[in-house]
């Protein structure tokens, strides 16, 4: 599916200022008819207004109290097919969870899972997480997840990884003091870079392990990694302050 075939609410959703490059795919396989229905019927009510530069050129902060009724706010960065995000929302009904994912097919998969699970404490930004960082109030998020991010394996592309200061600085700004940041990856060099870069952004390392968190839901990507002999690694950081 081309960008021109995407619903209006997705076209240009990740566009930021002219200097903000976006790397990675926005769409993949042709969407199933049911997925097109999810996008057309459900995305509009689950997508907060005021995140994109077109909707909010002044970059006014979001009113999270209005969006989530004063509940603690969690953030998932790049939710993939959405299984972990829906699992966390169902397990923690007293929180509000925002997920970011620029890949149209992943957004459609998440919307289907939301319908099936009946969870109501989720919102979706179908675009670049940096646009969301722009408008999240300072110290407003109490937990963030980064699960199996794009590894960008070529050395010349390592600067595109999320665990660089260009992403981690804005993340640190929106996380409250003491907030948790969890990272899961099966790429050894991504582990190395995460352990080097995240503390430089104002985080303390809490744990690193080959054993998953107690509330973890293994994703499709993780199962594929295990079948192919790769070893998952789980890291937990705490925002300083």
Curated annotation (Swiss-Prot):
Keyword Cell wall biogenesis/degradation found: no
Binding site for substrate: 154, 186, 219-222
Keyword tRNA processing: yes
Positions contributing to S-adenosyl-L-methionine binding: 76, 101, 128, 150
One example GO MF annotation: tRNA (guanine(46)-N7)-methyltransferase activity
Biological or metabolic pathway of the protein: tRNA modification; N(7)-methylguanine-tRNA biosynthesis
Catalytic activity: guanosine(46) in tRNA + S-adenosyl-L-methionine = N(7)-methylguanosine(46) in tRNA + S-adenosyl-L-homocysteine
UniProt keyword annotations, A-Z: Methyltransferase, S-adenosyl-L-methionine, Transferase, tRNA processing
Cellular component terms (Gene Ontology): tRNA methyltransferase complex
EC number(s) stated in the UniProt entry for this protein: 2.1.1.33
Active site: 150
Function: Catalyzes the formation of N(7)-methylguanine at position 46 (m7G46) in tRNA.
Family: Belongs to the class I-like SAM-binding methyltransferase superfamily. TrmB family.
Protein name: tRNA (guanine-N(7)-)-methyltransferase
Organism: Cereibacter sphaeroides (strain ATCC 17023 / DSM 158 / JCM 6121 / CCUG 31486 / LMG 2827 / NBRC 12203 / NCIMB 8253 / ATH 2.4.1.) (Rhodobacter sphaeroides)
